[in-house]
């Protein structure tokens, strides 16, 4: 266990490049608020609101979920400002391997959802442990996915939905369908470590990936110190930007896979920049979620084709921004939210 790891500060990208935060007024003058309808219910939402912020190096996306407070959401703002005001790090690769994402739909809807993805699906992340559903629902969904994709790599994401005993029972059954890893099956780091030990003892092939234990933790490196995961799932926005996420991966010394926070192509481009900058990338990234949206802010969405996404910049379309714009009351709510998060970020940067 490496006990010398230390968490980089919020606003790390600006610290690292010795760049001041852009003035708040400039940020607000270049802010566009949108609401994008979705084709399926995902994490209980049918549409996605966000604020796009444009600067000298492009646009960033500020899209913390509506229930998040300023303290948690400030990392998302740091990411958006870094994307808009700082150059992207030099990439290691220009094509990103992706997984498709299957929401917790009934088994009979699996072929319909998978048909929305272009080309061959080589890796699929399946949502399980949804509130109000049963393990039988999870098994049926995974079985339907395996029937539809006999050669694809499958992985499941429980979003902390199982108990320790329930997770072990679920993995015994789900491993029959050849899943390669389970993402955040339980809530606590202690239970993650116990589950990892238990499945190794039973010889189950699935690995354990940490998501919420990293992106929602005050100390995102605690899971690595506790040897509670085989790999880490990282998201640029909740971790405060590409540079801070890369620093966390370097310190944790765990394989990493990048996932989206359900953003438009603007936010996905930031996630792709993070994936492109990782020293190694063993698994497909969860950046194919634009396919779950009925619209996008650009004429050329960042979507997967045959399991890969090309690294490229995204320019929002003025016509789409106008069509997807929120009403003025909602826009003002986002302005106030950005302002509150900016104050948190300002303090973190010592300004």
Predicted regions and their residues:
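Catalytic core of soluble alpha/beta enzymes
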Residues: 131-270, 275, 295-297, 302
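Mid-domain alpha/beta scaffold segments of enzyme catalytic cores
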Residues: 60, 65-109
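Short, charged beta->alpha transition segments
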Residues: 84-87, 100-116, 131-132, 139-144
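Short beta-strand elements
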Residues: 49-54
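Hydrophobic faces of well-ordered beta-strands that scaffold small-molecule active sites
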Residues: 34, 60-62, 94-102, 122-126, ...
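Flexible C-terminal active-site loop/helix
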Residues: 2-32, 36-48, 59-64, 83-86, ...
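Active-site mouth loops of central-metabolism enzymes
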Residues: 36-44, 95-110, 128, 158-164, ...
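Glycine-rich, proline-tolerant flexible connector loops at the mouths of alpha/beta enzymes
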Residues: 61-71, 122-139
């Amino acid at each position: 266990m490496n006990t010398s790891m230390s968490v980089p500060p919020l606003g790390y990208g600006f610290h690292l490049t010795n760049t001041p935060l852009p003035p708040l007024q400039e940020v607000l003058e270049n802010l566009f608020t949108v609401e994008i309808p979705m084709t399926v219910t995902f994490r209980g939402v049918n549409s996605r609101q966000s604020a796009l912020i444009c600067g000298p190096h492009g646009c960033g996306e500020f899209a913390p979920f509506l229930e998040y407070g300023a303290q948690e959401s400030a990392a998302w703002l740091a990411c958006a400002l870094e994307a808009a005001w700082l150059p992207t790090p030099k990439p290691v690769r220009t094509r990103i391997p992706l997984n498709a994402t299957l929401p917790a739909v009934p088994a009979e809807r699996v072929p319909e959802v998978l048909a929305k993805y272009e080309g061959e699906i080589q890796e699929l992340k399946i949502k399980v442990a949804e509130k109000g559903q049963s393990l039988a629902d999870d098994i049926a969904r995974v079985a339907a996915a395996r029937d539809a994709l006999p050669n694809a790599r499958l992985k499941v994401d429980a979003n902390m939905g199982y108990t320790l005993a329930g997770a072990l029972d679920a993995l015994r059954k789900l491993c029959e369908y050849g899943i390669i890893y389970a993402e955040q099956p339980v809530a606590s780091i202690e239970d993650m470590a116990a589950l990892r030990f238990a499945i190794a003892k039973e010889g189950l092939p699935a690995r354990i990936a940490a998501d919420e234990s990293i992106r929602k933790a005050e100390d995102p490196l605690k899971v690595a110190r506790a040897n509670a995961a085989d790999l880490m799932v990282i998201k640029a926005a909740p971790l405060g930007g590409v540079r801070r996420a890369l620093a966390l991966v370097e310190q944790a010394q765990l394989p990493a896979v990048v996932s989206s926070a359900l953003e438009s192509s603007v936010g996905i481009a930031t996630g792709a920049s993070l994936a492109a900058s990782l020293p190694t990338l063993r698994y497909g990234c969860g950046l194919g979620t634009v396919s779950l949206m009925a619209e996008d802010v650009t004429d050329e969405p960042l979507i997967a084709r045959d399991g890969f996404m090309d690294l490229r910049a995204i320019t929002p379309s003025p016509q789409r921004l106008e069509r997807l714009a929120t009403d003025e009351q909602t826009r003002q709510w986002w302005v106030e939210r950005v302002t509150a998060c900016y104050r948190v970020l300002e303090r973190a940067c010592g300004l």
